[in-house]
């Protein structure tokens, strides 16, 4: 099954990523079923979430639902099987030289894909994405021959990448599209009204290479759900507490500038964020994080799912899209990851020096790395 405009990820609900309250097992499963019942037909999971538990939970939630009635997207790439963590950085990428040589890439990918499918309780993905690649994962021919073998074995119909978890990687993503053109079908990127940068640099290359984009975190840390206001108290351990001070206040001020456009169409702020994002070149699906905020005034997570499922078929005008982009412009607000000019030294799993190959990518696509991919100001 092909991608649908709206998608649901197993990181929603706070059990596997620390955003808001962690739902009970019963409510977590019910939310997935509720998403399906309301019309959401793309579901995404990653094997690294609680060492495969998210896969299992998704399989339980979808049990009994006809397999051909939804699009299933898997994500693999962090090697959870030896259980070797790199401290706070989490599990190593499967391409890490400390784990294996390139001639073992294909066997690892086959094993990881099969184990994920087994946990979900099905025999195939509609799409399988490479999770948070390092520089090897983006560019290594042997790694992508291993990915291609999964398609040949009919374990998946399509292939792609899911960069992250932080923002950046623009030139690496484009290089991957070009180097493996015809093999990379889909990619999940960070893109939304509050974060048009740097993801927008990827859009023309995606269109040229026929890559369909899935935009994550369009909700911008939950702000577009409209129940995170100035003075909001986050729960202990919530990932959002690590964001720069004042981000809630600054984000809400921008949302209020965008609100008249949502009011014109009678839509919610989440729906506005999704419609703006879907108006961007090559973006075919949006997958916000659904969060059950703590506190008495929070909106029920089920209501947030309803808003996504009810996304109307509205086309914002070009002027409205530009107004939203201008309000949310975040260029230069952070240090990016991936290949970028601010990094020097030995390559790390999530950032590396700007190579001559990446410089050439930048030149082909009109990107000046030192102007367009560097930190300039706080958000």
What residues fall within each predicted segment?
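N-terminal binding-site loop/beta-alpha segment at the start of enzyme catalytic domains
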Residues: 1-74, 78-80, 365-379
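Acidic (Asp/Glu)-rich catalytic clusters
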Residues: 2-3, 37, 61-67, 71, ...
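Structural preference for beta-strand elements that scaffold enzyme active sites
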Residues: 3-7, 41-42, 69-73, 124-129, ...
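Conserved, mostly hydrophobic/aromatic
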Residues: 8, 28, 35, 43, ...
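Glycine/proline-rich, positively charged
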Residues: 17, 89-192
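Short, flexible, mixed-charge acidic loops at enzyme active sites
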Residues: 22, 83-92, 227-235
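Structured C-terminal cap/extension of enzyme domains
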Residues: 41, 204-379
């Amino acid at each position: 099954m092909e991608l649908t405009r709206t998608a649901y990820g197993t990181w929603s609900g706070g059990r596997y990523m620390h955003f808001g309250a962690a739902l009970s097992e019963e409510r977590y499963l019910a939310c997935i079923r509720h998403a399906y019942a309301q019309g959401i037909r793309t579901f995404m999971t990653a094997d690294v979430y609680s060492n495969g538990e998210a896969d299992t939970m998704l399989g339980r939630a979808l049990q009994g639902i006809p397999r051909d009635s939804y699009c299933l997207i898997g994500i693999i790439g962090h090697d959870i099987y030896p259980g070797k963590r790199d401290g706070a950085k989490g599990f190593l990428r499967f391409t890490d030289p400390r784990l294996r040589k390139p001639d073992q890439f294909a066997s690892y990918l086959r094993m990881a894909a099969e184990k994920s499918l087994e946990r979900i309780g099905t025999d195939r993905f509609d799409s399988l994405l490479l999770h948070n690649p390092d520089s090897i994962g983006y560019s290594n021919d042997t790694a992508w021959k291993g990915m291609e073998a999964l398609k040949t074995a009919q374990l998946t119909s399509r292939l792609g990448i899911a960069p992250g978890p932080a923002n950046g990687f623009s030139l690496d993503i484009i290089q991957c599209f070009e180097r493996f053109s015809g093999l990379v079908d889909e990619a999940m990127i960070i893109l939304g009204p509050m974060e048009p940068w740097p993801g927008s640099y990827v859009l023309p290359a995606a269109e040229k290479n026929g890559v369909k984009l899935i935009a994550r975190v369009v909700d911008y840390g939950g702000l577009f759900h409209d129940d995170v206001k100035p003075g909001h108290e986050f729960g202990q351990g919530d990932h959002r507490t690590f964001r720069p001070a004042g981000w809630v206040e600054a984000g809400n001020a921008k949302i209020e500038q965008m609100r008249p456009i949502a009011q014109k169409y009678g839509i919610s702020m989440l729906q506005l964020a999704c419609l703006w994002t879907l108006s961007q070149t090559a973006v075919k699906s949006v997958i916000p994080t659904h969060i059950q905020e703590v506190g008495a005034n929070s909106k029920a997570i089920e209501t947030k799912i309803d808003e996504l499922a009810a996304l109307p078929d509205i086309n914002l005008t070009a002027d409205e899209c530009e107004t939203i982009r201008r309000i949310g412009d975040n260029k230069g607000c952070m240090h990016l990851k991936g290949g970028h000019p601010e990094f020097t030294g030995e390559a790390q799993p999530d950032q590396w020096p700007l190579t001559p190959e990446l410089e050439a990518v930048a030149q082909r696509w009109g990107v000046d790395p030192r102007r367009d991919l560097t930190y300039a100001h706080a958000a």
